[in-house]
């Protein structure tokens, strides 16, 4: 008889409540799977509670050992993992730096370097069970001390750009900005206990973020490539920013898992213009693209021997004002810009209608705690009047974006909408190598955001006061206090009451213009396994294989 939980303990009491929410059509199947497995239910048990059979973990075709896989992807300058700010960084280092927990395309959470975990009833204490038999590729054993050390590092708010601190907020002493005394306890070589300062239903999902790669005690950014100690099955074999990077299978390492197939994986950077990727596909220079966007989705459909995969997600783009900029401190200025933009029109013009309109609060209808608000009004006359009342009727706003296909086009569409109101806007388009350096600092710019399983995760990461990724520089005491309460509530209906207020604050304060939620697409060669589009852009090197 199969276990219902990954640790053999009884199911967490909240899981039955989640099941009732599904039956009452208050929670989607995907969100139930995410929340149940985050609280320790096995995937099999979570599916069976809904009367479903879990999909087989086996690949659809038999993978062959060996070969090379060539992937179009931006090759960015490496950073310390907790300061990663783009998925591409993690997809390369994932070859040797692994994760405690993995978020799967079906919405479930799977233990990797953690074998299992459990939570008490009110989600204020977690027990993390380290996977036995794991070794670093230098021969040392992977233990609970490694887990505790990494979590302690995630909690250090003094590290510039450390977004993991936002995810570990319930472990942090607000006075020191570091892990609270007694918050992280090593019980024995294989067990870590987390004692939270407040209930937190998002702690395990936070450990699945691409910024949470597990590093050794000897880690330094300077020796990340020259001395690549990790637990994974690959090693770096060259890394040239903006050009190319590669991984090779580490044949001298006894990896704890046994499913690494490709001998070599190459990441080739063609820049931000996707026409180069199409040329690479047609000339057999690459085997898959990182993402297919815009008109190139249909163009890549026509490449012989290639196939399309897709994922419906809560991925999005936001156009935000940085509220530390003098001109954008006035919320009426920010609201005027939002009032001038018809999000449905931007979806059609910027992303060819491949998604659904959003509502300027960064919480998606697929999030379990989403609260429906009245439709926003587009009133360009009022927008200009508000801007003029703020003394900026003749001011020319500079709207910045990266120079690529869909993000450039979407930002162009937003600028055109604002101009229709009579508000002046000029566009500045930056190459990726420039844009990525200061994406959180621009006064008025657009940024793409990945999905997170819970709406409260997104708001805590992107809009809580003082967080590393708070690119809007938004700081609102009522918002922070309400968010803290919402993060402690497991019941989606109860949390939705607070979420409605959070969404309203986002709109009232004009924090973002959020045009749409987007569907994701990727093309790859037929016969390449492990290459399907992932809802959070993960590429797992150990799953890539030729059939």
What do these predicted regions represent?
Residues 71, 139, 291, 416-466, ...:
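Periplasmic binding protein-like
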Residues 522-547:
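Long beta-strand-rich cores associated with HINT superfamily self-processing modules
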Residues 104-108, 199-266, 272, 381, ...:
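Gly/Pro-rich hinge or "lid" segments in bacterial periplasmic/extracellular proteins
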Residues 219-222, 252-299, 415, 424-426:
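Ligand-site clamp/hinge motif
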């Amino acid at each position: 008889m199969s276990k219902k939980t990954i640790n053999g303990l009884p199911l967490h009491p909240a899981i039955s409540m989640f099941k009732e929410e599904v039956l009452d059509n208050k929670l989607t199947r995907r969100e139930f799977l995410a929340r149940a497995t985050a609280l320790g239910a096995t995937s099999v048990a979570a599916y069976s509670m809904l009367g479903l059979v879990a999909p087989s973990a086996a690949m659809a075709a038999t993978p062959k050992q060996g070969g090379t896989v060539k992937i179009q992807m931006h090759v960015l300058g490496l950073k310390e993992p907790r300061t990663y700010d783009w998925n591409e960084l993690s997809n390369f280092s994932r070859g040797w730096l692994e994760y405690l927990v993995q978020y799967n395309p079906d919405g479930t959470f799977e233990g990797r370097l953690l074998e299992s975990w459990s939570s008490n009833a009110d989600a204020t204490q977690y027990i993390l069970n380290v996977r036995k038999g794991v070794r670093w590729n230098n021969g040392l054993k992977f233990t609970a001390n490694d887990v505790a050390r990494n979590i302690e590092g995630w909690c250090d708010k003094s590290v510039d750009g450390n977004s993991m601190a936002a995810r570990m907020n319930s472990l942090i002493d607000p006075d020191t900005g570091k892990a609270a005394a007694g918050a992280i306890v090593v019980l024995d070589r294989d067990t870590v206990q987390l004692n939270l300062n407040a209930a937190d239903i998002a702690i395990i999902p936070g450990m699945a973020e691409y910024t949470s790669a597990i590093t050794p005690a000897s880690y330094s950014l300077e020796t990340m490539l020259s001395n690549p100690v990790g637990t994974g099955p690959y090693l770096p074999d060259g890394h040239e920013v903006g050009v190319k990077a590669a991984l090779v299978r580490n044949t001298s390492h006894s990896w704890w898992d046994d499913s690494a197939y490709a001998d070599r994986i190459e990441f080739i950077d063609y820049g931000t213009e996707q026409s180069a990727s199409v040329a690479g596909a047609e000339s057999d220079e690459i085997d898959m693209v990182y993402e297919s966007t815009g008109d190139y989705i249909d163009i890549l459909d026509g490449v012989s021997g290639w196939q399309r995969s897709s994922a419906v997600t809560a991925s999005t783009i936001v156009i935000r004002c940085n509220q530390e900029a003098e001109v954008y401190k006035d919320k009426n200025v920010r609201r005027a810009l939002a009032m001038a933009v018809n999000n449905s029109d931007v979806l059609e013009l910027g992303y060819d209608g491949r998604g659904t309109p959003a509502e300027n609060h960064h919480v998606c209808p697929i999030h379990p705690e989403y609260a429906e608000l009245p439709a926003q009004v587009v009133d360009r006359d009022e927008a200009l009047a508000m801007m003029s009342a703020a003394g900026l009727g003749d001011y020319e706003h500079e709207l910045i974006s990266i120079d690529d296909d869909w993000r450039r086009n979407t930002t162009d569409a937003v600028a055109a909408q604002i101009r229709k109101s009579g508000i002046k806007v000029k566009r500045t388009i930056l190459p990726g190598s420039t844009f990525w350096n200061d994406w959180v600092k621009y006064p008025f710019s657009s940024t793409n955001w990945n999905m997170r399983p819970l709406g409260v995760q997104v708001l805590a990461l992107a809009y809580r006061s003082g967080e590393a990724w708070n690119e809007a520089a938004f700081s609102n005491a009522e918002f922070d206090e309400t968010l803290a309460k919402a993060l402690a509530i497991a019941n989606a209906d109860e949390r939705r009451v607070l979420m409605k207020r959070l969404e309203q604050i986002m709109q009232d304060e004009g924090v973002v213009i959020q045009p749409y939620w987007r569907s994701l697409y990727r093309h790859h060669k037929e016969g390449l396994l492990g290459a399907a589009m992932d809802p959070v852009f993960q590429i797992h090197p150990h799953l890539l294989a030729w059939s």
